[in-house]
Design a protein with these regions (language model features):
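Short, 15-30-residue, compositionally biased linear elements
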Residues: 2-3, 309, 348
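Fold-core signature of tandem repeat domains
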Residues: 294, 303, 317-319, 324, ...
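Sec-dependent signal peptide recognition
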Residues: 2-10
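Feature for extracytoplasmic/surface-facing segments of secreted or surface-associated proteins
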Residues: 18-299, 304-315, 320-334, 338-341, ...
Length: 439
C-alpha cells in the first residue's frame, strides 16, 4: 500500500553532522509534526538493476559503487545496501538491487579516478555521492554535480514544500549558476563527461575547475567546503576560493593548458569527442576578473583585471577573436592590422616607439632601425642588401639587423664579376677597386 512520505531533520545526517532543528513551517496539504514535511508517496523497489557511470574523471576499474537504502519517512540509512564494482574504463557499473523499502537511495562511489588535469590516475581515492529517486529510473550516473547538489537538495526538502525532483532541479541550477553557467541540461544523474552536449561540457568544466592543481586530499576538502557553503542559501560565498580557481584557470588558459587537458582526455581513447568545456572554464575566470564576454563589438578592447584579490590583479587583457588574452605591447599595437607587404615596417598603434616588420605572412617585433632608417625591415630575404638610410648613411642588412656598411660594401653592392685585372671606381666614394678573381 502506498503511504505518504515524511522527511525529518535527521535526513541531513546522511551526509553531514546534524545541527539544531529549525522552526517548522507550514506545508500545503495539512499540518505536520515538528521538523517534518510532507513528500510524495513511497514506492518499493524490487529486483532492479541500477547501472551508470561514476566519474570525476572516470573511476578506474575495481572502484566500488554502493546503492544504500534510505528509510521512506526519514531518509535515514537503514543499513541495507547492495554493492558493485567499476567494470569498464569509462567508469561503468551495474548493481543488482533485490529490495528497497522506498524509491529513495544514496549511491556512493569510492576509488581511484583518472585526473583530466594531469592525465594520470589519482594517487589517492575519493568518494562521490548521488541522491536519487529510483521510482522511474534505473540509470544513475555518479559525478561531481550529483555530489555537490545532494546536501543542498536535502536542505530544500526539509525547509520547503518541494518534491524530490524539484529540490534536486533547484540545487543543480544553483550549482551551475555559481560557476556562471546557465542552461537546461536535464538531470545531473544523466550527465556524462564523455557526452557531446552543453551539459557534458558544463560537467567537465566544473570538474576541471574544482580539481585545478589540487591533490586528492585538498580536492576532497574543497568539495566538502563548497557543499557546506551552499547548503542553506544556494549561494557560493567563498570569494577566496573562487579567486584561487579563477587564477588557476586564467594561467592555464593563457599558457595553452586547456588544450593539454583536452589532449589528456583524448589520449585516454574513451570517447570519439571531448565536449567544449573550455568555454565554461574561460567564462568563469573572465567573470571573476570582471572582464565580461569578449564580443565582436569589443574586439581590440583592453581591460585590466577587476579582481583586486587576484594574483594577476595588475594584468591587462585584450579582447581578440572572441577570447580575452594577455594584453602585451605586441597585441595592443598590432591587433587591428591587416597583412602587409613582405619586409614592410611600421610603428605600433599603442606604443608608438615599438617597431614591427611583416615577414613570412606575419607581423613580428623588430629593431627600431627597421622603422627609423626608412629602409623597411631587415628580413631573411634582404640579407646582404645595402641601402641609404634616412640619416644619409649607408647600411647593410646582416642577421636581421641594419648595420653601418663598410666603404667597400656600399661602393660595390650589386656589382657582377668582371675580367681579371679590371679597374672600377666605387659607386659611392672615389675609391678604385681591382677585380682579382672570384671569391
Amino acid at each position: 500500500m502506498n503511504k505518504l512520505l515524511k522527511l525529518s531533520l535527521s535526513t541531513a545526517c546522511i551526509f553531514a553532522a546534524c545541527g539544531d532543528s529549525d522552526k517548522d513551517s507550514g506545508v500545503a496539504g495539512g499540518s505536520v509534526e515538528d521538523g517534518e514535511i510532507i513528500a510524495e508517496e513511497i514506492v518499493t523497489i524490487e529486483n532492479k538493476t541500477i547501472s551508470g557511470v561514476s566519474q570525476k574523471g572516470p573511476f578506474v576499474e575495481g572502484a566500488s559503487v554502493t546503492v544504500q537504502e534510505l528509510e521512506g519517512k526519514t531518509l535515514a540509512q537503514t543499513g541495507r545496501s547492495y554493492e558493485g564494482k567499476i567494470k569498464g574504463d569509462r567508469g561503468e557499473f551495474s548493481v543488482d538491487v533485490i529490495n528497497l523499502e522506498s524509491q529513495f537511495a544514496l549511491l556512493k562511489a569510492n576509488g581511484f579516478y583518472l585526473n583530466e588535469v594531469t592525465g594520470k590516475e589519482s594517487e589517492s581515492q575519493v568518494t562521490l555521492y548521488a541522491f536519487t529517486d529510483l521510482s522511474n529510473r534505473s540509470q544513475v550516473n555518479v559525478n561531481l554535480l550529483t555530489h555537490l547538489e545532494h546536501e543542498r537538495s536535502l536542505y530544500l526538502l526539509k525547509n520547503n514544500d518541494l518534491t524530490v525532483k524539484k529540490a534536486k532541479e533547484q540545487a543543480e541550477n544553483e550549482i551551475l549558476a555559481s560557476f556562471g553557467i546557465q542552461g537546461d541540461f536535464g538531470s545531473s544523474e544523466d550527465m556524462n563527461i564523455f557526452g557531446t552536449g552543453d551539459g557534458s561540457a558544463a560537467l567537465l568544466a566544473i570538474s576541471t575547475l574544482m580539481q585545478s592543481d589540487l591533490k586528492e586530499g585538498a580536492f576532497s576538502k574543497r568539495l566538502a567546503d563548497y557543499a557546506s557553503d551552499i547548503e542553506a542559501d544556494g549561494v557560493w560565498d567563498n570569494e577566496k576560493v573562487q579567486t584561487a580557481i579563477a587564477d588557476w584557470a586564467a594561467k592555464t588558459s593563457l599558457k595553452g593548458g586547456l588544450a593539454s587537458i583536452r589532449k589528456n582526455i583524448e589520449d585516454w581513447e574513451l570517447s570519439d569527442k571531448v565536449p567544449a568545456f573550455e568555454k565554461y572554464v574561460n567564462s568563469f575566470w573572465w567573470e571573476n576578473y570582471k572582464l565580461g564576454t569578449c564580443t565582436t563589438k569589443r574586439e581590440g578592447e583592453v581591460k585590466k583585471n577587476g579582481n583586486s584579490s587576484s594574483a594577476l590583479k595588475d594584468m591587462e587583457f585584450i579582447c581578440l577573436d572572441g577570447a580575452w588574452l594577455e594584453a602585451t605591447d605586441f597585441s595592443k599595437d598590432t591587433h587591428s592590422w591587416k597583412a602587409g607587404k613582405e619586409g614592410e615596417s611600421r610603428y605600433g598603434d599603442s606604443v608608438t616607439t615599438n617597431c614591427y616588420v611583416f615577414e613570412e605572412g606575419a607581423w613580428r617585433d623588430a629593431n627600431d632601425s627597421d622603422c627609423s632608417l626608412e629602409l623597411d625591415g631587415c628580413t631573411e630575404a634582404k640579407e646582404g642588401t645595402v641601402g641609404k638610410g634616412s640619416d644619409k648613411s649607408w647600411y647593410i642588412c646582416r642577421d636581421n639587423s641594419w648595420e653601418e656598411a663598410s666603404t667597400m660594401e656600399k661602393d660595390t653592392y650589386g656589382w657582377k664579376d668582371a675580367a681579371e685585372g679590371d679597374i672600377k671606381k666605387g659607386d659611392v666614394t672615389d675609391t678604385v677597386y681591382v677585380f682579382n678573381g672570384k671569391k
